[in-house]
């Protein structure tokens, strides 16, 4: 029934709640419809749906861990004027993390968008990561050090810790700008926490994740 509701709001071009945290069960685990896959050789961070007094949030906490948390979309999101909007806060960042260094490239939370082939762990899809960084310059971005099919954009950093931050991005426009080609459909969205490089502690919360069409 919840999947049917998601399909309906996507079709009607009204905000689509991709988390549905309000109806999620409090306690450890992910909201319904979401999956987890640990980065190879790593344990997944701990997840918990909590109520912070203003509503339900998903808390992600780990140290020396890394995993993908994702929701595959059906139907896929075709190119449009839509935007992805979310609200998050970071309570603890891994010490010495730096997006500019391969050996220090950790983040307390990244929100990512998968374009193309839905098998997001294969080699066909392209992924944009909207990342909570550290002390890198505002607006810092680059191709991933792992693959040119992955692209990382810093949208917040160390000065934004402990505060709820609202973000809104246009993934299709970013895709065109980055890869200079027509974007395929969006097949999945997800969040990620990785502290496997620095082995530091990280704690982050996300309250809302929506697809909005004006």
Q: Which residues does each predicted region cover?
A:
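Hydrophobic h-region of N-terminal signal peptides that target proteins for export
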Residues: 4-16
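Extracellular carbohydrate-recognition regions
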Residues: 14-40
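Extracellular/lumenal carbohydrate-interaction signature centered on repeated Trp-anchored short motifs
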Residues: 72-84, 158-161, 182
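Extracellular ligand-binding interfaces
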Residues: 91-160, 200-205
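Extracellular beta-strand elements of beta-rich domains used
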Residues: 21, 189, 207-211
């Amino acid at each position: 029934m919840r999947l049917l509701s998601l399909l309906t709001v996507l079709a009607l071009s009204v905000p689509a709640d991709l988390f549905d945290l309000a109806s999620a069960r409090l306690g450890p685990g992910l909201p319904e419809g979401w999956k987890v896959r640990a980065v190879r050789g790593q344990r997944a961070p701990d997840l918990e749906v909590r109520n912070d007094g203003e509503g339900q949030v998903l808390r992600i906490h780990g140290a020396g861990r890394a995993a993908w948390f994702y929701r595959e979309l059906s139907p896929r999101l075709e190119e449009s004027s839509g935007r992805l909007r979310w609200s998050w806060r970071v309570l603890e960042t891994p010490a010495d993390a730096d997006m500019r260094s391969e050996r220090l490239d950790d983040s307390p939370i990244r929100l990512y968008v998968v374009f193309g082939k839905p098998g997001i762990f294969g080699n066909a899809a392209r992924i944009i990561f909207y990342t909570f960084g550290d002390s890198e310059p505002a607006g810092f971005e680059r191709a991933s050090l792992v693959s040119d099919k992955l692209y990382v954009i810093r949208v917040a950093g160390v000065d934004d810790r402990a505060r709820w931050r609202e973000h809104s991005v246009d993934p299709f426009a970013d895709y065109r700008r980055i890869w200079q080609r027509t974007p395929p459909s969006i097949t999945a969205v997800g969040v990620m926490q990785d502290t496997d490089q620095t082995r530091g502690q990280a704690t982050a919360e996300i309250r809302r994740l929506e697809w909005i069409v004006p």
